[in-house]
């Protein structure tokens, strides 16, 4: 399929998301806490139905989906085994959206029919789709949606309007065009668009941070610079999974297993959708809901075993209630735990704990990247300074990129990306000041910054080739960093260039004569103007 056709499908998908949001608003659910549940579940339901039908038509090119309802048990069992091998769900004919339109679209209990379908799909595919929390609570893929409309009389019509929008859209065209390429490039911007109204955390809430695709892509490309097979990748503050998806795409979805944890129920729901859209259903069981700092689920089996770790943790958070418990864990937080401040507890630098956790989880050949406030890289005190000193003294850090302000949607804080390893293997550190790159734009009356393709290429080329560029990048030794009081700020190492020009004695005298002549002319003009003004004032009369 030509690119312009694929672009049209992408635009149609974005329009579908907008339509679903408009419907929710018209039924009183605009900006409601449950709106995202309805939209993500309906979007996922349509995706799974279309994927099921697409695969059915590939397996049985001489039959239509209507023939599926007459399949005997033996035929279904064989078909289901093929589906399971491909990590696709088992759906009965009466689970499909087409069946709802065929049999129940005008029913007064249509909402109950959809709820029942969601429950059946979840139960019949529990092994494939269920996830868990740190306390072993099972979290199903779907839940009933009609409950979110308070007025029972509106539930059937609300469901009817939603399904009507779903019916008029078809993912199958996208599947056919993406057969020979990964779907990440198609679905990533769609997922980003889906998220934009549900990720307004204001920079302060736990696990609601969203990493822009451009930043996620830079991190993935700088971490993975050679073919990689059978690796474990981990994000302890996974959010909606943007960093993990970019890394998995760079590695290859069949060559990696994802591990994730996040405390936010909303983020985990979005993360599961992201995994399914990106053919990473095999890693769903590793997406855990829970507090990474007090109950790091994956530490039990994979501490010191992760090949790659990425993280964009919350920067500041009040964790005073968990402070005592966290402080007892001297192994995970070996460099210490920030003190509880007397005044504003919401400013506790929680990211320092995630950083230490990441260092613990890497294997000996592992590499990682974490997003942190730019102030961290030149911290002179506190746990921040202890971490920087550890990274430098142990020669673990190998790169820092200072990003432009306002490049992250939910925080005005200047941020940097720190690249690190588990085992010392480098003698120099690449420091890049990309803070002046990008272009400004306005979204919802807020000024933001985005990186252009040329900006991304410049960052990648400079980092990978360890190129030194005036006022942009520096390649420094660990001894130099110690001499600069452990600062990882690129600007500390830029050489101020002497831009003055050398001139001869004769040229100097000529310039002085020229300047003298110009000033004399200006003074003469000034005196003439002064005389003219005085004469004019003298000629003024009182009438």
Describe the role of every protein-language-model region:
Residues 200-204:
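Conserved adenine-nucleotide phosphate-binding loops and their immediately adjacent elements
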Residues 50-199:
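Long recognition/docking surfaces used for binding and targeting
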Residues 18-21, 167, 191-199, 220-224, ...:
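Amphipathic, well-packed alpha-helical segments that form the structural scaffold of globular domains
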Residues 1-85, 539-543:
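Non-catalytic accessory regions of SAM-dependent methyltransferases
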Residues 34, 81-87, 425-434:
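A structural motif corresponding to the C-terminal lobe/cap of the Radical SAM core domain
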Residues 2-5, 303-543:
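A conserved structural/catalytic subdomain of Rossmann-like adenosyl-cofactor enzymes
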Residues 205-311, 316-328, 372-375, 385-388, ...:
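Conserved S-adenosyl-L-methionine
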Residues 18, 33-42, 139, 160, ...:
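Non-catalytic, well-ordered alpha-helical scaffold segments
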């Amino acid at each position: 399929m030509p690119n312009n056709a694929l672009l049209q499908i992408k635009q149609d998908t974005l329009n579908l998301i907008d339509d679903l949001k408009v419907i929710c608003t018209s039924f009183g659910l605009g900006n409601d806490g449950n709106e995202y549940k309805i939209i993500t579940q309906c979007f996922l339901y349509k995706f799974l139905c279309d994927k099921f039908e697409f695969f059915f038509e590939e397996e049985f090119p001489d039959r239509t989906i209507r023939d599926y309802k007459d399949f005997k048990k033996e035929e279904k069992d064989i078909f289901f085994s093929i589906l399971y091998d491909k990590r696709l769900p088992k759906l009965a004919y009466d689970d499909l959206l087409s069946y709802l339109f065929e049999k129940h679209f005008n029913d007064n209990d249509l909402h109950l029919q959809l709820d029942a379908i969601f429950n059946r799909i979840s139960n019949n595919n529990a092994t494939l789709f269920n996830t868990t929390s740190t306390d072993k609570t099972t979290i199903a893929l779907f839940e009933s949606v009609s409950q979110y409309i308070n007025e029972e009389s509106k539930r059937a019509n609300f469901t009817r309007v939603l399904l009507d929008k779903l019916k008029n859209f078809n993912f199958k065209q996208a599947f056919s065009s993406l057969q020979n390429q990964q779907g990440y490039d198609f679905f990533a911007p769609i997922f980003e668009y889906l998220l934009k109204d549900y990720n307004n955390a204001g920079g302060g809430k736990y696990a609601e941070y969203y990493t822009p695709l451009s930043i996620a892509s830079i991190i993935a490309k700088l971490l993975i610079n050679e073919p990689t097979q059978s690796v474990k990748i981990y994000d302890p503050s996974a959010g909606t999974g943007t960093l993990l998806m970019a890394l998995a795409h760079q590695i290859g979805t069949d060559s990696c297993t994802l591990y994730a944890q996040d405390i936010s129920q909303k983020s985990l729901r979005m993360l599961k959708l992201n995994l399914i859209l990106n053919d990473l259903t095999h890693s769903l069981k590793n997406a855990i809901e829970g507090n990474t700092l007090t109950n790091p689920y994956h530490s039990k089996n994979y501490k010191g075993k992760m090949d790659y770790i990425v993280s964009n943790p919350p920067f500041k958070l009040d964790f005073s209630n968990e402070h005592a418990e966290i402080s007892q864990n001297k192994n995970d937080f070996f460099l210490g735990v920030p003190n509880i401040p007397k005044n504003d507890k919401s400013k506790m630098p929680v990211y320092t704990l995630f950083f230490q956790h990441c260092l613990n989880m890497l294997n000996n050949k592992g590499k990682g990247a974490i997003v942190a406030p730019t102030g961290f890289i030149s911290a002179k005190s506190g746990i921040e300074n202890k971490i920087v000193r550890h990274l430098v003294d142990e020669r673990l850090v190998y790169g820092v990129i200072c990003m432009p302000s306002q490049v992250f949607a939910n925080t005005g804080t200047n941020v940097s990306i720190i690249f690190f390893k588990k085992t010392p293997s480098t003698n120099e550190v690449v420091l890049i000041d990309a803070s002046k790159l990008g272009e400004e734009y306005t979204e919802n009356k807020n000024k933001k910054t985005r990186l252009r393709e040329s900006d991304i290429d410049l960052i990648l080329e400079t980092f990978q080739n360890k190129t030194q560029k005036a006022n942009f990048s520096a390649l420094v030794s660990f001894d130099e960093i110690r001499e600069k009081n452990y600062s990882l700020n690129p600007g500390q190492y830029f050489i101020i260039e002497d831009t003055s020009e050398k001139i001869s004695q004769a040229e100097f005298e000529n310039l002085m004569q020229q300047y003298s002549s110009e000033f004399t002319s200006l003074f003469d003009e000034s005196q003439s103007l002064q005389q003219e003004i005085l004469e004019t004032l003298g000629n003024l009369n009182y009438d």
